[in-house]
Amino acid sequence: MSFEHHTGDLESPFRRKLLLGTAALSAASLLPPQAFVQQALAQQFPTAKVSTTGLAVTDSEVTVGILHSVTGTMAISETGSVEAEKLAIEQINAQGGVLGRKIKFIQEDGASDWPTFAEKAKKLLVNDKVASVMGCWTSASRKAVLPVFEQYNGMLYYPTFYEGLEQSKNVIYTGQEATQQIIAGLDWVQKTKAAKTFYLLGSDYIWPRTSNKIARKHIENVLKLKVLGEEYFPLGSTQFNSVINKMKLSKPDVIYAIIVGGSNVAFYKQLKAAGVDLNKQTLMTISVTEDEIDGIGGENIVGAYACMKYFQSLDNPNNKAFVSAFHKMWGDKTVIGDVTQAAYLGPWLWKLTVEKAGSFDIDKVAAASPGVEFKGAPEGYVRIHENHHLWSKTRVGRARTDGQYDLVYETANLMEPDPFPKGYQ
C-alpha cells in the first residue's frame, strides 16, 4: 500500500467491519504481557544491524521528542498527554529500554499556537535528530507539523480523536477517526434517544468544522434527520449565552458539541446557569474527556454523553494497573481522559514497532507498523492497521458529578479504522 500523503480526495469503501476475536487482556500489570518482555529480552540487536543514520541514537541511549501545549488555551487538554508519555517512557526504561537503549526525551511547548508547533517540530527533527515524536492535540497543530515530518522524514505518534481524511507514512494515529467516533456515536444516540433534531456546535478550526460536516452528512443523508443549527466559536471563547438562548428556543433533541480546550469551562457553566439540565436535554460531546471535566466541574456537565474509546472508569486489569501507576507518578487527584490514554499508547507502540523492525530507521519503522499489537493497552487491546490508524472499540459514557464517566455502551469487538469513508468527504 502506498503511503503518500493523502487528503480528502482519496476514496475507500465505507466500512465499519469488526475485528472478530480480540486477544485476552493482560492481567498482570500495565507492562506488556510477560511473553512480550521475554521475547524482547531474548532477542539480540547488534549495533551494526540497528540503522541509526542521522538520528540521536547511541549504543546506550535513544532520544525522542514530546511536543504538546503546556501553556495557552489547549494546556487544559494536553497536559495529561505529556504526563502519560513520560509515564510510558519511565516504564519502558525500567524494562530495559528499546533495543537495549534507554529513552531520553526532549520536551517542547507548542503553546497553543500552530506556527510554534511547526517551528518546534523542525527543531526536534533537524537539530535534535529525535527518533520519534509524541505530540500535538488539535488537528490544526497536526496539519501544521505534517509537512515538517514528511519533509524531514520523522515519525509522529498523534493521540487525539480526529476527523479522518488523512493518512501519512510519517504518522501513527493512536486516537479514533470519524467512523469510529462521530458516525458510531450518532447512530447510538439516534437509536437510544429516538432523536430527530440536532444542533451542532464547535470551536472554529479544522477538526470541529470537518467533524460537523461529517456529522451533518450522516444526520441528513443517512439517518434522514434534521439539523436545526450549526455554530462555531474562536478557540478561547468564553461567551456562549447567545447560542444557548437559540438552542432553548429551537429545542433540539440532541446538542452535538465539539467545543475544545478552556472554552468548555465557560460553555458548560453557562449552560447550567441558563437552566439547561443535561439529565433531561441530551447532549453528546466528542471533545470533553475527564481532563476537561477537571476544569469544568462535574456538577456542571453531569448527564452529558461522550463518545470515546476510553474512560478512566473502565473495569479491566490493564486499566486498573495503568490508573494506579499514573496516580503514583502524578498524584491521586490527577484524572485520565481518552487522549491521555491514547498518548500513553504512543511510546509503547513505537517500542514494539522498533523491536519488530530491529531498527530505529524511520522507513523501517513505518513499514513494520501494520500489525503491531499492544495487549497491555489500558483500553484493552489495540492493533495498528495498514493505514496507520488503530483497530479499537467505540464506547459511550455518561458524565457523573465526580468528573468520571459511567460506561453505557461499547462495541462487542474492535472497529476497523476507515479514514476515508465514501460519501463523507
Regions found by a protein language model. Give the residues of each.
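Extracellular/periplasmic periplasmic-binding protein-like sensory domains
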Residues: 271-344, 355-360, 408-425
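Hydrophobic alpha-helical segments within soluble ligand-binding/sensing domains
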Residues: 49-50, 117, 174-198, 209-210, ...
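C-terminal segment of N-terminal export signals and the immediately downstream linker at the start
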Residues: 11, 33-65
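N-terminal secretory signal peptides
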Residues: 1-17, 21-41
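Beta-alpha junction/loop-to-helix N-cap segments that form part of ligand/metal-binding clefts
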Residues: 50, 76-83, 95-165, 233-240, ...
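Extracellular/periplasmic bilobed ligand-binding domains
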Residues: 212-307
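Solvent-exposed, acidic/polar segments of extracytosolic/periplasmic ligand-binding ectodomains
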Residues: 45-48, 373-425
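An alpha-beta-alpha
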Residues: 70, 171-235, 254, 331, ...
